[in-house]
């Protein structure tokens, strides 16, 4: 049985392994474990935040251990541009977020999960579009052109939107010039360092599967005229007619009419699944994951879907004097929905006396003849806009300790992005807003690619 030294409480999740072999297990909720070992074997007990213990197998009696806190391990280590440093020794302005704070969120990407986590860092959405991007400001708006921070994923320039929050080990935000000095002018807007999860050496293979679901909805809608109120208002002020009873002198409209907010807004569902497999041997560690996200927009006919694959491994040789590793992320996103800056304004202003459907019009949509606005649902339906983006991130490194304290690191990074855009416009008649007598189809694609090669020397001797 494994217990905590000060409280004598059982410790679950402690890794127990036979030294020099791949045999291992993990303690249960009661701190108990079972492992096959021969007399003379050494059992190693290890877990985060506790001092590692080694015990020799001398007989068939149970081996009980009491683990003490490792104060050095518990002192937070912060990643900065030119290495790592204990937080107590840090002079620069750095904000950090741990995996514990990010796990369990139904967030589409790491930028969304970062909202409200670090003081002084602003994270906002440019629109309510589920396919829209997030804007992150680390140092405020200091430039008229570009205030975006530089994103570094596992040591190479990357893209925060392609990282699944469940795959993140930590996020460090470098706010001042000293912490981000190694990146030069590219770090004018700050630096966001993302470290993805790794396996652990001498750890048995572990499988984690998570499933999340959530909802998004509009908690309150605006109060607008119903059909009868709109008709009475229009007739009283002698507004131009729309053919549905709002014109001066026409028969008043009777009833509620169309609630366009109810037609266009919905309770949107979000589904997310993630599976991670990790482990390690005596000389290395590995971690890989797959994830899927399906996110509906609050606005009808808007959806976002994404697939993520991540691979990461690290291996050491010659008593850890040579280390090699790689990190790869493949991200596929699919988005649909025709949204512009006036979409919500159109929903609030479109007359409630106009029905959603009218079979006498081309396309079967209800129209207005006295307002230059489209039927909101018709506009979202006849304009079918879709995007599909594939992003590939690959980073490989080699690190060698030349002499004690002096390390050379070679880093190679590749980023590639391919986007396909498709826009289809169906036949419609939307009154004074306009009509389309024959369908239109437009397609285009673009490809973007970048390479980075870095060589660094780091000397650390205390």
Language-model segment annotations:
Residues 1-311, 316-317, 322-329, 393:
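Short, small/polar-rich motifs associated with maturation and membrane association
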Residues 285, 405-412:
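Beta-sheet entry/capping signal
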Residues 399, 403-404:
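Long hydrophobic segments that form regular secondary structure
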Residues 201-257, 298-304, 308-393, 409-462:
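Surface-exposed loop/interface segments of Gram-negative outer-membrane beta-barrel transport/assembly proteins
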């Amino acid at each position: 049985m494994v217990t905590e030294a000060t409280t004598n409480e059982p410790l679950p999740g402690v890794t127990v392994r036979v030294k020099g072999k791949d045999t291992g297990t993990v303690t249960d909720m009661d701190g108990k474990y079972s492992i096959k070992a021969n007399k003379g074997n050494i059992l190693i007990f290890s877990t985060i935040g506790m001092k590692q213990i080694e015990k020799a197998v001398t007989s068939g009696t149970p081996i009980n251990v009491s683990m003490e806190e490792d104060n050095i391990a518990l002192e937070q280590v912060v990643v900065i541009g030119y290495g790592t440093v204990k937080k107590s020794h840090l002079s620069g302005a750095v904000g950090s977020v741990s995996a514990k704070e990010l796990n369990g969120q139904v967030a589409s990407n790491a930028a969304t999960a970062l909202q409200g986590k670090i003081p002084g860092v602003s994270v906002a959405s440019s629109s309510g579009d589920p396919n829209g991007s997030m804007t992150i400001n680390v140092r405020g708006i200091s430039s008229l052109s570009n205030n975006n921070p530089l994103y570094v994923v596992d040591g190479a320039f990357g893209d925060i939107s392609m990282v699944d929050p469940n795959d993140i080990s930590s996020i460090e935000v470098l706010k001042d010039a000293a912490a981000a000095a190694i990146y030069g002018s590219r770090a004018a807007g700050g630096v966001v360092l993302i470290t993805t999860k790794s396996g652990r050496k001498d750890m048995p293979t572990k499988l984690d599967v998570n499933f999340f679901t959530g909802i998004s909805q509009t908690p309150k809608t605006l109060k607008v005229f119903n059909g009868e109120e709109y008709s009475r208002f229009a007739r009283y002020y002698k507004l131009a007619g729309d053919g549905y009873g709002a014109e001066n002198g026409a028969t008043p409209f009777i009833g509620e009419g169309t609630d366009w907010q109810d037609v266009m807004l919905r309770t949107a569902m979000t589904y997310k699944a993630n599976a991670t497999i990790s482990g390690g041997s005596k000389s290395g560690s590995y971690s890989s994951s797959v994830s899927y996200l399906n996110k509906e927009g609050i606005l009808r006919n808007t959806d976002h879907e994404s697939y993520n694959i991540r691979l990461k491994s690290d291996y050491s040789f010659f008593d850890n004097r040579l280390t090699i590793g790689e990190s790869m992320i493949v991200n596929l996103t699919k988005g649909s929905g025709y949204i512009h800056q006036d979409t919500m304004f159109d929903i609030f202003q479109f007359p409630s006396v106009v029905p959603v459907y009218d079979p006498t019009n081309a396309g079967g949509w209800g129209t207005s003849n006295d307002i230059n606005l489209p039927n909101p649902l018709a506009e979202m339906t006849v304009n079918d806009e879709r995007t599909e983006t594939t992003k590939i991130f690959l980073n490989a490194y080699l690190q060698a300790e030349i002499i004690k304290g002096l390390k050379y690191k070679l880093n190679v990074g590749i980023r590639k992005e391919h986007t396909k855009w498709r826009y289809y416009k169906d036949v419609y008649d939307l009154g004074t807003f306009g009509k389309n007598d024959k369908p239109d189809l437009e397609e285009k694609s673009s490809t973007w690619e970048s390479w980075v090669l870095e060589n660094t020397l780091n000397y650390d001797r205390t």
